[in-house]
Amino acid sequence: MSEEHPNATAYRRAADAFRVGDLRAIEDLVVQDVVWHVPGRHRWAGDIRGRDALLAWLRALAPIGFWLREHDVFGNDAHVCALSYMGARREGVDVETRVVSIFHFRSGRQVERWFFPEDAEAWDRIFDARE
């Protein structure tokens, strides 16, 4: 079995940091002008531009019970592909879907991310929290 590519390991470190609420660790794993493309018809869909905006977006996920679990992660010098389960558990909601995330990496840090959920309706329900 071959050793995991360092970019795949960097993605795993970011996912692990998210799970424990360590946004400072995530800050070190993304470039200043990072862009995440979040699909859907929910209020948080769209492009998230910049590290500060991304960290604020991630901070906002805690109250909606968002979670993620990797199935597999592949990487090379420029890209990472993460096959994951993502979902939310909160009062009245217990939903999940499989998601493919494609990342562009530069110098071991995330530059851009695209999410491709298998079930668009479930994906929207994950983020459809009423405040």
Predicted regions and their residues:
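C-terminal and inter-domain tail/linker signature
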Residues: M1-E131
